[in-house]
Every structure is written in structure tokens, then in C-alpha cells.
Swiss-Prot record:
InterPro entries: Carboxypeptidase_A_C_sf (IPR027461), Class_I_gatase-like (IPR029062), LdcA_N (IPR027478), Peptidase_S66_N (IPR040449), Peptidase_S66C (IPR040921), S66_fam (IPR003507). GO terms for cellular component: cytosol. SUPFAM superfamilies: Class I glutamine amidotransferase-like (SSF52317), LD-carboxypeptidase A C-terminal domain-like (SSF141986). Pfam families: Peptidase_S66, Peptidase_S66C. It is an enzyme of class 3 (hydrolase). This is Putative carboxypeptidase slr1534. It comes from the Bacteria. Its EC number is 3.4.16.-. GO terms for molecular function: carboxypeptidase activity; serine-type peptidase activity. One of its GO terms (biological process) is proteolysis. Belongs to the peptidase S66 family. Coiled coil: none annotated. The active site is at 116 (nucleophile), 206 (charge relay system), 276 (charge relay system).
Amino acid sequence: MSSLPKNFLQPLPLQPGDRLTVVSPSGSLRELADLQKGVDIWRSWGYEVIFSQGYHNRFGYLAGTDQQRRQDLLHAWLDPQCKGILCSRGGYGSARLLEDWQWPAISQPKWVLGFSDVTGILWSLLKSGIISLHGPVLTTLSDEPDWALERLRGHLQGLPLAPLTGNSWQKGMARGRLVAGNLTVATHFLGTEWQPDFENVILAIEDVTESPYRIDRMVTQWRASGNLSQVAGIALGRFSECEAPAGFPSWTVEEVLGDRLGDLGIPVVADLPFGHGGVNAILPVGSKAELDGDAGTLSFL
């Protein structure tokens, strides 16, 4: 586990003409048409989008060997002309890439954007005190509504982020560093060097295609490990396709989360517009945030 740095660096705002590099740190690409749609959006905004050497590699279910994926990420990170790194898709693989990995110090950090399995990459940047963006990968970008796209575009150009609104489950107010990610991926990082210190953070989580009992098992692990007793507030995104199998006696995922999170004595806001299967509004991982359990809002400070 690594303590969060006291101060975080935010990459500089992007300018039209800046270079962005596509990397595939996790699973191998399948959705080539969707990838191109995402690239076209970035190019329509005036950015130069280039592809890492191995973005379309295949090694089993991975986008290349661990070393190939490390090398692509490293090359983009060290490229002085590259101002941002766009992850092509999620899947699985970031945990393997992060073995024996350290972010090299550079004069000016750059934006890294992704979600799902990319949670591991975003959390590793926390250790270096660098703000990153939890948000659409290239293969899902074209599914975003106009307001979410403009919110992404504006923030990368230096505009403040508008708050997100959900539904209040537990009242109260909390402020802290925002740590966001996929619940399943995050759970597998507990107890590793990439697990951040959760003391006084706002934890934002989402998931997809996990049965309610599996969500219960993961959240119970967070409770038993003592991590949930440290967080200041919990922001819940979308838990998409998390229904129990037909004919299987079960609670709903909402009932599970309400039961497992309702006695922590901290604000909990649910149904925020981020995650799989719908709007995936960007979240600045590592930035300061405020969770208002009375108003049902997540704001960025």
C-alpha cells in the first residue's frame, strides 16, 4: 500500500494540434470500427492522434506480451511531443503490466484517460502524485452523449468540471482526494503496492456483469480489510448488467450495496453517471472532491 502524496500535479491543458498517443495496456483489440470512431472524435477536436507500435498486438487475450505493452506505455510517456495517452480498451492485463513498473520522472506529466481494467494504470499514477482521468476508452467514446463529450473536451482544455448528480443514499458531507475505478479490478489491487491509502478519500466505484453475490463478496472484503472504515464518502456509478441469473434467489445489486454500505456512517451517493453501459462522465482521479450526501452531488474542487 502506498500513501497518497500531499500534493498532486495536474497535466497542462491541451491545445489543438497537440499529439495524443493510443496505447493498449490491457486486452487485445476487437472493436476496430468503434476504435476508429473514437479516434475520429479526437481528430475532429483538432488533435493529432498517433498509434503506439503495438496497439494492435495480440498475445492470447492480451494486447501483446507484458514487456511489449510496458514498452508502448513507456515510449508514449517519455515522448516529449506526446501530451496525452488514450487507452484503446479495457479487458484484462494492467496488473501484469504493472509488475516491475515505475513511472519515470518527466518534466511535465501528461494526461492518461481510461477506465475498467485501466483502473490499475490510474491507481499507479496516484503513487506518483499525478492526476489522471477515469473515463471513456477509445472503443466506447462514440457512445457518449454530447454533454459528456463536451465536458471531457472542455476539462482537457482547462475548464472546471461541472458537478455530477445522483441519488442520496446516506446523508452527510465529505471532502477528500478522489479515487475512482472498477470495483472488481480495484479489489484485486488490495494488498498490493498499487493500493492507495484510503484514509479520507472519496471512493468512486462502478462495475459490470457481476452477480449481486459477487458484489457482496467484494464489498465484504473491503469491509473486512478495514479499507471502507477509512474512506470519507462513497460515490457509486453504474452497476450495469449486475442481475442475478434467472431463477436464482437473490437480492438486487442495489439492495446488496445498500446493506453493505449503509452502516458506515459516511455519505453515500448512488446512480452517478459514470461506468459501463451508459454515460461515462470523466472523473479526475487524484483531485480534491466533495461528496454531498444531502444534495446527492459529487463536485470537483
